[in-house]
Amino acid sequence: MWGYTVEKGWFHVKHEEIESIASHVFGGNVDKAYAYHELLATDGSTRGFIGPREVPKLWSRHLLNCAVIGEAMDENIRVADIGSGAGLPGIPLAIARPDLTITLIEPLLKRSVFLGEVKEKLELDNVTVIRGRAEEKAVREQLGLVDVATSRAVAPLGKLAGWSLPLVRLGGKMIAMKGSSVHEELERDEKMIWKAGGGKVKIFSVGEVLEEPTTLISIRKVR
């Protein structure tokens, strides 16, 4: 079993319970989740992709709460992870949902190189890495239209919709991880979302198995 750090102040549980939660979320690919945790805690931290204070919180704040967003996605669809960074949420999602075809979009060279290394080391055949920004024409042409565009902590909601919805087919949607400010962002950025082609909005939680479920906002592309 891959090594990992049991964090304090979030789970308040034993090693066995963390293993149980990880096994539930990642299923038969749980060993790949441990391997990814190890890469983030070592290379990811050394190369500046994960802050030292975040390393003890990798399971709760990064791997598990990202993986559970798959609960909001249909089977066998194409997903784009915008501003993937160290691979969040795209890599945990790809591990938990091998039926998904996931493209990680990341503008910085050093991060995109790391993502490529993770893909190879974990043998994630359902993952592709594109270096660039979601709003760039070349990226959009290379990607094509996807069913879902997802992201975490990338930008305010209105700007995020402007990046995400153009990548999505008509009838598809963007699914963003957001915190408690999501309602205020939605009210503030309503016009920007509409301009980007957004329609029906849904705010909901996934990951009931977690102590702190993940809050998502889903916006369907209608035009």
UniProtKB/Swiss-Prot annotation:
Entry-linked InterPro entries: rRNA_ssu_MeTfrase_G, SAM-dependent_MTases_sf
Domain of life, source organism: Bacteria
Pfam families with a match to the protein in the record: GidB
One annotated Gene Ontology cellular component of this protein: cytosol
Keyword flag Methyltransferase: yes
GO MF, any single term: rRNA (guanine-N7-)-methyltransferase activity
Binding positions for S-adenosyl-L-methionine per the UniProt entry: 83, 88, 134-135, 152
HAMAP family assigned: 16SrRNA_methyltr_G
Official protein name in the record: Ribosomal RNA small subunit methyltransferase G
Lineage: Bacteria, Bacillati, Actinomycetota, Actinomycetes, Mycobacteriales
